[in-house]
Amino acid sequence: MELETHLSKYFTLAFTHKSMSLEMREKLAINSPIMLKELLQTIKTHCPNIKECMVLSTCNRFEIYASLKHGANTHEQKSALLKILAQNKKMSVSDLEKCVLINTDESAVHHVFSVCSSLDSLVVGETQITGQMKNAYKFAFEEKFCSKDLTRLLHFAFKCAAKVRNLTGISKQGVSISSVAVKEALSIFEKERIKDKKALVIGLGEMAQLVIKHLLNKQFEVLILGRNAAKFEDFVKELEEPKKVGFQNVENLNAYINEYELLFCATSSPNFIVRNSMLKETIFRRFWFDLAVPRNIEKPTLNHIFLYSVDDLEPMVKENVGNRQESRTKAYEIVGLATMEFYQWIQSLEVEPLIKDLRELARISAQKELQKALKKRYVPKEYEGNIEKILHNAFNTFLHHPTIALKKNAQKEESDVLVGAIKNLFNLDKSNANHAQNLNLYKCEYYEE
């Protein structure tokens, strides 16, 4: 009889800035919890061989992480997911096929760890991706699209990312999309000899807040256009120079859009916020940075407006990360080791319950025979306690070597066969229902950095 493996089969499907254009990433981008839940539900409904699933959508990547049922065909899962995305996003399967990156098993785990550790980011070492992955996992977990398998994977990924940051210093070198955009803006400011260090920022999400902080560090005055005044008040409390920041409702955009040389836009809107119909000719040149995906700024038709997208910043990013190569090499060593340690950890999780079950089976068998002996008066009742101790010690001695051997072999590839054989031999194979009760043992600390 073929024994089923108890290790999870991991699968990742990814589109990134390395393989897909900004225009196509815009179509895939998910900008609301409702859209995300609908996509996850569609996957759950139409892909029965996918046990658990989560989606990561950022300005530079769209990725699906899944665990598959035993025996699931990865090519079939890839085809099914591409078909769902094509229908959901009104794209062609052939276009998606050209850009997709697929990883399974160990390579899938390595990929997730690399992404979480910011080694696959446009800006290597930026920490924003870890928070984005935590939010993506948190949503999928709370909406019951992922459970034990992805919880274990993401738990270890966050640990790996922290280790990479702590041991390599790769995140301490101050380069991010927001910092590169502000650095380029400062360079423009100096070349253009702009008198007033003022900037207009549309949005108050994570990216926009980072831009604002970088601008303030460069002594800019910032006007923020947003929708949530209460969020602005909370944000201002974090700033060292709150007096240099103002706030207006984004509905007043028309009143300000033609007044600033420097503009940064980073919102989650699926549509253009800045449109050509709002624009007027000015006597000064304007430099705009659209850091959103999908883009928030319609391509200007007026002269003297220079627009930078996320992808336009990539060459500038590469200029700033050259000194990270040594840290990156060390980081990949950590990720490779973490991938091996993850599978050792997973295998040990399968062995520990087996050892516990073997000891419990021995205890129950001994107790059953002791009660028979007492009932038939083979031994006096007053000896019951002493006999229990003797039996307990005897079975501990008997199981000592098998216990050590199981723990030792837990880190070997053949452990699945060994564990499966013992469970089958002693009739200890239980349904996976019990695993749900132990979920909190592995639940990710997605609120921690």
UniProtKB/Swiss-Prot annotation:
PROSITE patterns linked to this entry: GLUTR
Residues that coordinate or bind NADP(+): 203-208
One of the GO biological process terms: protoporphyrinogen IX biosynthetic process
UniProt binding sites for substrate: 58-61, 121, 126-128, 132
E.C. designation(s): 1.2.1.70
Gene3D superfamilies with a match to the protein in the record: Glutamyl-tRNA reductase, N-terminal domain, NAD(P)-binding Rossmann-like Domain
Pathway it works in: Porphyrin-containing compound metabolism; protoporphyrin-IX biosynthesis; 5-aminolevulinate from L-glutamyl-tRNA(Glu): step 1/2
Catalytically driven reaction(s): (S)-4-amino-5-oxopentanoate + tRNA(Glu) + NADP(+) = L-glutamyl-tRNA(Glu) + NADPH + H(+)
Keywords associated with the record: NADP, Oxidoreductase, Porphyrin biosynthesis
Residues the record marks as active site: 59
Residue(s) at site: Important for activity: 111
An example molecular function term from Gene Ontology annotations: glutamyl-tRNA reductase activity
InterPro entries membership: 4pyrrol_synth_GluRdtase, 4pyrrol_synth_GluRdtase_dimer, 4pyrrol_synth_GluRdtase_N, GluRdtase_CS, GluRdtase_dimer_dom_sf, GluRdtase_N_sf, NAD(P)-bd_dom_sf, Shikm_DH/Glu-tRNA_Rdtase
Matches recorded under Pfam families: GlutR_dimer, GlutR_N, Shikimate_DH
Subunit text: Homodimer.
Entry's family note: Belongs to the glutamyl-tRNA reductase family.
Cited function: Catalyzes the NADPH-dependent reduction of glutamyl-tRNA(Glu) to glutamate 1-semialdehyde (GSA).
Something else known: During catalysis, the active site Cys acts as a nucleophile attacking the alpha-carbonyl group of tRNA-bound glutamate with the formation of a thioester intermediate between enzyme and glutamate, and the concomitant release of tRNA(Glu). The thioester intermediate is finally reduced by direct hydride transfer from NADPH, to form the product GSA.
NCBIfam families from the UniProt entry: hemA
Domain notes: Possesses an unusual extended V-shaped dimeric structure with each monomer consisting of three distinct domains arranged along a curved 'spinal' alpha-helix. The N-terminal catalytic domain specifically recognizes the glutamate moiety of the substrate. The second domain is the NADPH-binding domain, and the third C-terminal domain is responsible for dimerization.
Name of the molecule in the record: Glutamyl-tRNA reductase
Native source organism of the sequence: Helicobacter pylori (strain J99 / ATCC 700824) (Campylobacter pylori J99)
Lineage, opening ranks: Bacteria, Pseudomonadati, Campylobacterota, Epsilonproteobacteria, Campylobacterales
Gene: hemA
